[in-house]
Amino acid sequence: MSKRYKQLTEKIDVTKAYSVDEASLLVKNLVSAKFDETVEVAFNLNVDPRHADQMIRGAIVLPHGTGKTVRVAVFAKGAKADEAKAAGADIVGTDDLVQQIKDGIFNFDIVVAAPDCMGLVGQIGRILGPKGMMPNPKTGTVTPDVATAVKNVKGGQVNFRVDKKGNIHAGIGKASFNADKISENLITFVKAINRHKPSSAKGRYIKNCALSLTMSPAIKLDVMQLADMK
């Protein structure tokens, strides 16, 4: 453990489960890097993703965005292509965009597709899938309303998906955000997780949750408080 990391650890009471407001204030005191660190949240859920009805996946637009500039590629044609461009899409195409991806050029972070272009997107599913870029209706990235999808993604939409161990990780802001913005983004994200609770899930749904910065130790959150956020 480095001296810097040890000093940060000493600021956290490891025996305590912090409220959202307390954690949002404390995480501001853990800034140590020379860059604008990402505020990260990690959940451990009491679900078994091997069961289809317990595969937690979705998207949420955070009220204050993520602080990250997101580049969006859109598969659309005709009027839908024009709408995507007007909404601020960085790249809009069809066959040309397929070829670009086949050539290994990824000058974008997220892919959105109109439903009538999913046949094209299917040609490159094996490329996009492993990169986590495959458009999906559950995250709002396959939709006839491509303009809204682009605005949501640009405006701070966070996609989330539980891993095989029941964990969800996401960036919900930057260290430069004030504590209120961090708190409001976190509450919005927690509510989204709670809305996705499977009816078949037994016992405590959110088993553990922690808030941290890119280079900081984790702050344990009070899961009883989180459970009441609907």
UniProtKB/Swiss-Prot annotation:
- One Pfam family cited in the UniProt record for this chain: Ribosomal_L1
Q: Which GO terms describe its biological process?
A: regulation of translation; translation
Q: Name one GO cellular component term.
A: cytosolic large ribosomal subunit
Entries under InterPro entries matching the protein: Ribosom_uL1_bac-type, Ribosomal_uL1, Ribosomal_uL1-like, Ribosomal_uL1/biogenesis, Ribosomal_uL1_3-a/b-sand, Ribosomal_uL1_CS
What keyword terms does UniProt attach to this protein? Repressor, Ribonucleoprotein, Ribosomal protein, RNA-binding, rRNA-binding, Translation regulation, tRNA-binding
Name the Gene Ontology molecular function terms of this record: rRNA binding; structural constituent of ribosome; tRNA binding
Query: Which residues are connected by disulfide bridges in this protein?
Result: none
Assembly state and interactors? Part of the 50S ribosomal subunit.
The family annotation for this protein states: Belongs to the universal ribosomal protein uL1 family.
Q: Note the NCBIfam families from the entry.
A: rplA_bact
- What is the protein's known function? Binds directly to 23S rRNA. The L1 stalk is quite mobile in the ribosome, and is involved in E site tRNA release.
Q: Would you tell me the protein name for this molecule? A: Large ribosomal subunit protein uL1
